[in-house]
Amino acid sequence: MYGGDEYANNSEYYDDYAHTGDPQLDMEYERNYYAARMPDNVKYFLINFCQAIKEGNLYDIQNMYENTFPQISDHHFDKTAWPEEQEVAAIVDNDKVFLILYKELYYRHIHARISGGPKLEQRINSFFNYCDFFNLIISAQNPVMLELPDIWLWELVDEFVYQFQNFAQYRARLTDKSQDEIQQLCVNHSNEWSILCILNVLHSLVDISNIKKQLEAISQGSDPQTVAGDFGKLSFYKMLGYFSLVGLLRVHSLLGDYYQAIKVLEPIEIHKKSAYSHIPACQISTSYYVGFAYMMMRRYADAIRTFSDILLYIQRTKQLYSTRSYQNDQINKQAEQMYHLLAICLVLHPQCIDESIQQVLREKNYHDAMFKMQCGDLEVFKSFFVFACPRFVSPCPPAADAPMEDYVKDPMEHQLLVFMDEVRQQKDLPTTRSYLKLYTTLPLTKLASFIDPNASEDDVSKLLIRLLCFKHKMRNLVWSKGPSGLEGTFKSGSELDFYIDDDMIHIADTKVSHRYGDFFVRKILKFNDLNRKLKNINI
């Protein structure tokens, strides 16, 4: 109804109005003054946007949110901010709800488009605007009758967590701030964007929507409406609750609390499709953080399954988000990060994956890097991890008397240290595996001589430790069923198993042969479909 072309024409700014001292006349003058300064297409868009939100017209709201707003941003406000609140308030009759939603988009635009990022005052104002929005919907005695598209609700929660992350990095960077700015951050703004506020908001949205009870009811085959409550029955609250669970997953991952990150999703069956996973960006973000948490918990089989499933999903559904360039860029970047993480997991825990994913790994030359990692090149592990990991944050700001340094990288360096310590413990295992795969029985002394031609008796004792390490590292907790992603059974992920009797290693190859039939059936069906389409083309 309100496409971008309708707002294509611009008008010049001008200032012809003066105040009279009469409150009524001044209000009218102010409305006319700001309306005159604003381009006509922007003014009409804001008026129609406000009207659509008032009427709860989801189709128009989604069209204007997904299409018209980005188009006007590109045309008028590519490197500048949208009009200030008072300018917009004058033409929408001070509609409180609309102004809160408008400011959410206003500050989001500043974070995304303005060179140098938002100023401290803008960061603080954005925080208080989120507080106004969440207080409006959480503190109400009765549900607020507000209808917003699910994509906006997801991006609102996602942006809320992103701005927390961005502010945590901003306050940790002391080298570009004066002493007065640091004092202001530590004294005047110590509570804004605090981790307690973020967790409190997200948990409150989860609780008020009863989303956990609804998900449990769905998993048991019951009607979720019976446990939804007055608020949770509304799609607005229900979806906010669901997206808040994903927001909590992201927050705990950014803090390095991977156990809690997975635990907070317990009502969601991570490895199954859900009726709530219709927003591609939400599903992809969920899988990224779940897969990363699994990797850091040394549950490589679950991480590989999570990454493989979502990368296949991305391959098959690109057309769903390709029309929105900024979302396309974000998803492509996250997909690239997941390919890096998948490569790491496959080196540490080799196993078969889908042929189409293997094909991408080959085409993008991941195999060269994977070979280097298998040979113990720690720098490749490090570079892959740094590229693909989340941008970790500290829950606490630097102390007021801390040295003037850049503390942004401290959380990431700590997580890198933990990860590389695990890699160092495993870097010799591929060599051990390669020798064991060649034999069914192998004396300990012979294996020791393969590894080191000058091996002594002490080296044989160390070899026992290495073999025990191999056994230990190859046994992972693997999810099999149930709503909790933390549950599972211990399984050996190696392609071979062995036991030691006296000084002899007895080896059994447990590798499952490739099933090429499914691959060729898919290719034949695809070829037949292509052949039918070619025959239907009239030349």
UniProtKB/Swiss-Prot annotation:
Entry annotated with the keyword Cytoplasm: yes
GO molecular function: translation initiation factor activity
Domain PCI, chain residue ranges per copy: 306-514
Keyword presence, Cytoplasm: yes
Record's keyword terms, sorted: Cytoplasm, Initiation factor, Protein biosynthesis
Pfam families: Paf67
GO biological process, one term: formation of cytoplasmic translation initiation complex
Protein's cellular compartments: Cytoplasm
GO cellular component: eukaryotic 43S preinitiation complex; eukaryotic 48S preinitiation complex; eukaryotic translation initiation factor 3 complex
Subunit structure: Component of the eukaryotic translation initiation factor 3 (eIF-3) complex. The eIF-3 complex interacts with pix.
Biological role stated in the UniProt entry: Component of the eukaryotic translation initiation factor 3 (eIF-3) complex, which is involved in protein synthesis of a specialized repertoire of mRNAs and, together with other initiation factors, stimulates binding of mRNA and methionyl-tRNAi to the 40S ribosome. The eIF-3 complex specifically targets and initiates translation of a subset of mRNAs involved in cell proliferation.
Record family assignment: Belongs to the eIF-3 subunit L family.
Name used for this protein in its record: Eukaryotic translation initiation factor 3 subunit L
